Amino acid sequence: MSKIQSTFQRLQVTGRRALIPFITAGDPAPELTVPLMNALVEGGADIIELGVPFSDPMADGPTIQRASERALANGMTLRRVLDTVREFRTGNAETPVVLMGYANPIEAMGVERFVSAAREAQVDGVLIVDYPPEECESFARAAKDAGLDPIFLLAPTSTEQRFRDVARVGSGYIYYVSLKGVTGSATLDFDEVAARIPQIRAQVGMPVGVGFGIRDAESARRIGEVADAVVIGSRIIEEIERSPRDRLAANVTAFLREVRTALDQVEGSVR
């Protein structure tokens, strides 16, 4: 059982929801990424999604695009992202880390070389936005062979065939994109999410995390009533953008604690 799978199993036993924050490696500066990851854990993160910056992040809204631009300007590369995870692991061996990004940097490195390096850095999962499950069985197999969970996206427009494809090649959890659009979008249709999640869970058989459009503790709590996990990214990036460096970690921790407290008010298992 992977670290991600055991995390969800432990949370399910206690009826808690996973809190999965996202930040971009190298934003606002490479030397601040590990302190920010530690701040996320202090704020109640169960799993960390660490963005690999890319020059054309097609699924991301303006906030995360700006974070990628800053990280790239700071010289962040896929290899440096792996070095960052390795540094994080010197102080935290428990919290699962999922790399989230796009295919181009991985293909430039080479899939086999990437999964080997990710395993050595103690990465736990990888979510490649532009790898459709029906076209990347070899990548998913290589990831699993290296002990990494290949994680895939589902959306309101996903077909039952896409559900079956994800169930066949994915592991760890499902990232359900709750909106048609890009990250950071403002309006969530809670009723649509509540209707869709049980269908996904029944057909795919994995925990379901919901992201896109979660802006505050209240929206996180409402999503937590139906989902196994809440993924929140753009709002954290905004906190990073507005915070002075000497308050950066403290502000991120404080915001995440509000979300964690709200999630912990949700009672009972969603299964």
UniProtKB/Swiss-Prot annotation:
It catalyses: (1S,2R)-1-C-(indol-3-yl)glycerol 3-phosphate + L-serine = D-glyceraldehyde 3-phosphate + L-tryptophan + H2O. The active site is at E49 (proton acceptor), D60 (proton acceptor). This is Tryptophan synthase alpha chain. GO terms for cellular component: cytosol. It is an enzyme of class 4 (lyase). Keywords: Amino-acid biosynthesis, Aromatic amino acid biosynthesis, Lyase, Tryptophan biosynthesis. The gene is trpA. Tetramer of two alpha and two beta chains. SUPFAM superfamilies: Ribulose-phoshate binding barrel. Its EC number is 4.2.1.20. Pathway: Amino-acid biosynthesis; L-tryptophan biosynthesis; L-tryptophan from chorismate: step 5/5.
